[in-house]
A protein has these predicted regions:
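Secretome/extracellular-domain signature
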Residues: 1-7, 173-270
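Surface-exposed intrinsically disordered loops and tails
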Residues: 13-26, 35-73, 203-222
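Short beta-strand-to-coil "C-cap" segments at the C-terminal boundary of structured domains/repeats
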Residues: 34-36, 84-91, 182-184, 238-241
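Enriched but not universal
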Residues: 43-143
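Surface-exposed loop/turn motifs at beta-strand-loop junctions within extracellular Ig-like
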Residues: 89, 155, 197-199
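Beta-strand-rich interaction surfaces with strong enrichment in secreted/lumenal proteins
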Residues: 131, 140, 168-170, 180-183
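Extended extracellular/luminal ectodomain segments enriched in beta-structured repeat modules
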Residues: 144-150, 186-190
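Short, surface-exposed beta-strand/strand-loop-strand elements in extracellular ectodomains
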Residues: 160-174
Length: 270
């Protein structure tokens, strides 16, 4: 599955009375990057073609260290999911300069015009070059001009177990994974961004009920005990808002069992 889930990776429908467990966790959702090597693994109905292949692409499980949205290192992503699009080169963007304050004296800068390049001068980043997409609980969109972009996704964490005063059953939801890749667009494209939601937590009430999974595919948990639901995956879709237009996916972590912590999402297997 391309999402975190409980009790099984990829579950996207509400759990039933026969699903869920008070004592066991489950796999997290797998990640995916659309490349020439992975295209054959795409489910039937894929709406993408070879012009959307990613380069320098990888998907990393949530039990491995990778770069966090803030730029630090994290081993698995906690909380809600996150997505980012960074402009590497955009053919239709105006030239700009950003001068570092450390330049104390007058300096001349020269640019070659009409060469379809975007320039930055100094160590600071141009604010418009990065688009960040935090969790909102709904789809977000952006329109990308022809150019080259770095795509990054962080999957959401699975829901925690509720201790109800017993520290032995305070299990932690599985952490989300990370996926990254570079895409070059030859024409203007609308993209659809889904930042997954963290799984929910259920207290031990003694009666069965459903704990809904996190936004964007987190599996639900049907239990009478204390357990969490799956975290949602984070993904970016190109051209149309369809599951079959996802070019990059970061898997969400699984929910907890009563006494078992959730499994990490992301990577090839989740």
């Amino acid at each position: 599955g391309w999402y975190g889930a409980y009790p099984a990776g990829g579950q996207t429908t509400p759990a039933t009375g026969s699903s869920g467990s008070d004592t066991s966790g489950s796999p997290g959702g797998s990640g995916y990057v659309y490349t020439s090597a992975t295209a054959s693994n795409y489910p039937s109905g894929c709406l993408l073609n070879s012009s959307y292949y990613l380069s320098a692409a990888k998907t990393i499980a949530g039990n491995t260290s990778f770069t966090s949205p803030t730029g630090s290192s994290e081993t698995g992503h906690s909380g809600n999911g996150y997505c980012r699009i960074t402009v590497i080169e955009c053919k239709n963007t105006a030239l700009y300069t950003r001068i570092n304050n450390s330049m104390k004296k007058a300096t001349a800068f020269y640019f070659k015009l009409n060469n379809n390049k975007m320039y930055g001068v100094g160590s600071a980043n141009y604010n418009g070059s990065v688009m960040n997409f935090d969790y909102t609980g709904s789809v977000q969109t952006a329109t990308l001009a022809p150019g080259t972009y770095k795509l990054e996704c962080w999957g959401a964490q699975g829901g925690n177990g509720s201790s109800n005063g017993n520290s032995n059953i305070n299990a932690v939801g599985g952490l989300g994974g990370y996926s990254v890749g570079t895409i070059t667009l030859s024409k203007t494209q609308k993209v659809y961004i889904y930042s997954g939601g963290k799984g929910q937590t259920k207290s031990n009430t003694g009666s069965y009920s459903t704990v809904n999974g996190g936004f964007n595919g987190g599996g639900s948990n049907y239990t009478c005990g204390s357990g969490g639901s799956g975290g949602g995956g984070s993904d970016i879709r190109i051209g149309t808002d369809s599951l079959y237009a996802r070019v990059i996916v970061a898997g969400g972590g699984s929910g907890t069992g009563w006494t078992i912590k959730g499994a990490a999402g992301g990577g090839i297997l989740g």
